[in-house]
Amino acid sequence: MSSPANLFPGLNDITDVLEEFPLATSRYLTLLHEIDAKCVHSMPNLNERIDKFLKKDFNKDHQTQVRLLNNINKIYEELMPSLEEKMHVSSIMLDNLDRLTSRLELAYEVAIKNTEIPRGLRLGVDNHPAMHLHHELMEKIESKSNSKSSQALKSESRREAMAANRRQGEHYSASTHQQDDSKNDANYGGSRHESQDHTGNNTNSRKRANAANTNNADPETKKRKRRVATTAVSPSTISTATAVNNGRIGTSTASRGVSSVGNSNNSRISRPKTNDYGEPLYCYCNQVAYGEMVGCDGADCELEWFHLPCIGLETLPKGKWYCDDCKKKL
């Protein structure tokens, strides 16, 4: 059968340390009292001579001043060995107490590791009023943190939905703009072909009229008229067609230039939607989303989401909320 020392090594070591504490302390304290007994008469004498030296005026009697200082120095020399011995004993007692404290901590760790002390005895009962209050406070803190996290999730989902709607609207506007450009190009190409056909028809009719006239004239007159008609009709026809085409091209170029200038002005006035990393920008501060944010309930709000510090709020508002720009539109 195992002995109690082997069954509970930690508790037995704790008991030994607690029994050794008063013995070691009393031994060293006794030595300190013996040292103080040696100085029981010297300390009052030293204090008396120091007070007398401080109260006396030594403006003229310097010899008395030197004599008193010598007496004080002699008493200090008598007390010095006792004071040094007292410091030595104190340092030894401190080291011994430090060793016993380390031994006690190690024994307690062994007792906890071997479950020598029951949990109820070590931590106390669980039905204490203070423990109930602690559990209630912890439940309130957890419920509050859960409510904040749910609000943050709602705001995040709402922000993602509004961002998706905005991207869909931008895609729809871009496709509409491309369709308008293609229609304009098609109209421009059709009008250009019509002008070329009309110019060609005029040229052919003129050629047929000149040919009919030259058939009735003499050969020399035919040759002369053919040369005059060729030199007269060709440059005018070419210049007319060129002028018409240049006019149409200039008009389309000018319209495109005006549209590009308008787009550049609009892009200069409008706020950037994303930063250099492609992240969307929100709020009056034109920054990315962070922390808790509140969404504007306005139908056509440009900024959409706002940081709580930027609008002067500490918590999320209840019900509908509108930004300053949307309030002006209401």
From Swiss-Prot:
Residues 255-269 have a biased composition (Low complexity). InterPro entries: ING_fam, ING_N_histone-binding, Zinc_finger_PHD-type_CS, Znf_FYVE_PHD, Znf_PHD, Znf_PHD-finger, Znf_RING/FYVE/PHD. Zn(2+) 2 binds at C296, C301, C323, C326. Zn(2+) 1 binds at C283, C285, H307, C310. It comes from the Eukaryota. The record marks Y282, M293, D297, W305 as: Histone H3K4me3 binding. The keyword Ribonucleoprotein does not apply. GO terms for molecular function: histone H3K4me3 reader activity; methylated histone binding; zinc ion binding. Keywords: Chromatin regulator, Metal-binding, Nucleus, Repressor, Transcription, Transcription regulation, Zinc, Zinc-finger. PROSITE patterns: ZF_PHD_1, ZF_PHD_2. A zinc finger (PHD-type) spans 280-329. Residues 139-272 are annotated as: Disordered. It is found in: Nucleus. Residues 231-254 have a biased composition (Polar residues). Interacts with H3K4me3 and to a lesser extent with H3K4me2. Component of the RPD3C(L) complex composed of at least ASH1, CTI6, DEP1, PHO23, RPD3, RXT2, RXT3, SAP30, SDS3, SIN3, UME1 and UME6. Component of the RPD3C(L) histone deacetylase complex (HDAC) responsible for the deacetylation of lysine residues on the N-terminal part of the core histones (H2A, H2B, H3 and H4). Histone deacetylation gives a tag for epigenetic repression and plays an important role in transcriptional regulation, cell cycle progression and developmental events. Present with 3250 molecules/cell in log phase SD medium. The PHD-type zinc finger mediates the binding to H3K4me3. Belongs to the ING family. This is Transcriptional regulatory protein PHO23.
